[in-house]
Amino acid sequence: APFDFDVSVKDIYSSIMTGAQLVLIPKEYFSTPPRLLDYLCDKKVTNLTWAVSALTLVSALKGLNYRVPESVKRVMFSGEAMPAKQLRIWQEKLPEAKFVNLYGPTEITCNCTYFPIERQYEDSEKIPAGKAFPGRRVILVDEEGKQVTEPGVQGEICSAGESLANGCLL
């Protein structure tokens, strides 16, 4: 992620905390999937933490038919809803990789929920946002601000915890 975007925090500090090497991908590589995939393979990248739009661009343009970055063991994505069709393409090309859906609204630094993907989804299915990370809390509230607890009832997602920006209240 660009350094002026909060998601870069996750990219930078996760590599420092785990002792992994952070590979910076030149922005222009994302417009040419073969060049991007060659780069991932050459650098032996093991973890992708990308926006959904970057993953879907590669799969929709059939980049994975050109070359599969087989060193990738984990794919985490956020920023928008992942289309099940595009996720299945990645899952089929990287069957041993773990896939994780991440969610976090603007007022959260990075993400507040995660959902490990353990199966393939049909096009008509929505991939769940998952459960709250430790130190965070996520609830659904109705139009009156009351917590929604019944399955299938719509509401607004509200979050609280250590990643919430100052001045934002649940």
Sequence positions of predicted segments:
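Short hydrophobic "strand-cap" motifs at the C-terminus of beta-strands
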Residues: 1, 25, 50-51, 61, ...
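Conserved AMP-binding/adenylation subdomain of ANL enzymes
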Residues: 2, 6-46, 119
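AMP-binding (ANL) adenylation modules
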Residues: 2-5, 29, 104-107, 147, ...
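SF2 helicase/translocase ATPase core recognition
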Residues: 9-11, 103-110
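Residue-level signal for inorganic ion chemistry
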Residues: 15, 19, 48, 75, ...
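Short gly/Ser/Thr-rich phosphate-binding loop of adenylate-forming enzymes
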Residues: 30-35, 52-66, 74-97, 135, ...
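AMP-dependent adenylate-forming
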Residues: 95-101, 116-170
